[in-house]
Curated annotation (Swiss-Prot):
PROSITE patterns: FAD_FR
Protein name: Ferredoxin--NADP reductase A
Organism: Sorangium cellulosum (strain So ce56)
Catalysed reaction equations from the record: 2 reduced [4Fe-4S]-[ferredoxin] + NADP(+) + H(+) = 2 oxidized [4Fe-4S]-[ferredoxin] + NADPH
Role: Transports electrons between NADPH and ferredoxin. Can transfer electrons to ferredoxins Fdx2 and Fdx8. Prefers NADPH to NADH.
Keyword Membrane: no
Superkingdom, taxonomy of origin: Bacteria
Pfam families the UniProt entry points to: FAD_binding_6, NAD_binding_1
Amino acid sequence: MVPGYTEETVLEVHHWTDKLFTLKTTRSPSFRFANGQFCMMGLVVAGKPLVRAYSLASANHEETLEFFSIKVPNGPLTSRLQHIAVGETILVGKRATGTLTIGNLRPGRTLWLLATGTGLAPFLSVVKDPETYERFERVVITHTCRRVQDLAYARYLEHELAADELLGEIVRPKLRYYPSVTREAFKTEGRITALLESGRIFADLALPALDPAHDRLMLCGSSEMLADTAALLEARGFEEGNSGEPGDYLVEKAFAGEKRSPLASASPAESTNLSGPA
């Protein structure tokens, strides 16, 4: 047993593409987290823990843990992790942390969850939280990727979550899913910043433009997207929040190459919630 970690058993492995995969594992009864947080996860290699920061794609009321990962060519961890099989074990850190929790936002009417690539992971946790729908009148989750096939969880967000026996009734009238692609033909093309600046996203969803009086946002994805979107929001009067002071929008810096959390020891080359410019 590695101090500070529990050993969890892999229950399911799903390969979305040659570059994206999801793991589901057992969950220690003692492991607690807030929806939107991340923890350290990895393997024992040569007798030592090899771990990276991973957002939890599962909700805190679920009995299993879920992780959404890219496959980094020659990445020390993901080059091994992508070949893991059901029944094998992984390490999961005993402590979760992170900025992307609804408690770090001021009260508002519409919650926007803006993701690129595997930055979708923490928002999968947030949209499965009943409290999210108690606090906000509308929830919009956007996912921008390079290719259509990279839009992992699209069916889940478009259909399956709304049909969920426990959550469907509160999700259906409030959740909107807005995917976009940057390098292929698709019904919605373009980077999320361009779609926000042009007003296309607001026209498509029949919603008003962003207003700091009632809109709240969370951002997770590539460092370029985070910087560009934060600048766009700041120019419109939005104030960034953190774990100490709630704000109008939140950025998970643990995966952005800045103000790295003590738990986020992932190197930029293998950061699990980073995707390149979409």
